[in-house]
């Protein structure tokens, strides 16, 4: 290879390298705010941490949230799927706090372990709405509202239904074997329905 061809190849390689480094760096810094809508859109920013997508009900719940918190309805949705891990939800909530969302909405995977991150949201002045399942915290002022079911009543109703059903079929106590599917351990739904 002659000298001019080597210089040409080196020049091309340097240009490609320069383009790669430029594309990966500083001209448009990637900050946590990049997910946020432009301020002139005047949208309410909602950070939602869904516990996962383990069932058709949860998928329908997620779809409902996406439809409700749409741009057409005046919202900008930041959505996170925690994949059944509390640490993922805590990380998402902290990300929402750092992005200064207007509201945080989440369905907690488990009942305990939320005091610290909810205190952080409260200190940041961000209202927290808990949906479906609830949390067990020392200070209920750490969240604004809980939207959910009476899980204990659901469990009682299911037990009464089963008792009536078996009685109607004339089963005796020694003829029945029952398997109870409880769901996520330590979730308010599981705790309430099995009390």
Predicted regions and their residues:
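Bacterial N-terminal signal peptides that target proteins for export
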Residues: 2-11
């Amino acid at each position: 290879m002659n000298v001019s061809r080597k210089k040409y190849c080196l020049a091309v390689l340097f240009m490609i390298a320069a383009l790669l480094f430029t594309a990966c760096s500083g001209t448009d810094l990637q900050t946590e705010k990049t997910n946020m809508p432009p301020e002139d859109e005047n949208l309410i920013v909602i950070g939602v941490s869904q516990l996962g997508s383990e069932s058709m009900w949860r998928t329908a719940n997620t779809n409902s949230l996406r439809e409700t918190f749409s741009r057409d309805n005046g919202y900008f949705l930041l959505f996170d799927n925690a994949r059944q891990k509390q640490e993922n939800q805590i990380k998402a909530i902290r990300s929402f706090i750092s992005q200064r969302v207007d509201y945080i909405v989440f369905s907690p995977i488990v009942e305990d372990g939320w005091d610290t991150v909810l205190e952080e949201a409260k200190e940041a002045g961000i209202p927290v709405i808990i949906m479906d399942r609830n949390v067990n915290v020392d200070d209920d002022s750490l969240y604004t509202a809980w939207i959910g079911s009476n899980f204990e009543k659901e469990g009682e109703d299911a037990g009464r239904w089963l008792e009536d059903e078996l009685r109607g079929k004339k089963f005796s106590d020694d003829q029945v074997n029952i398997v109870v599917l409880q769901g996520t351990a330590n979730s308010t739904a599981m705790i309430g329905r099995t009390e």
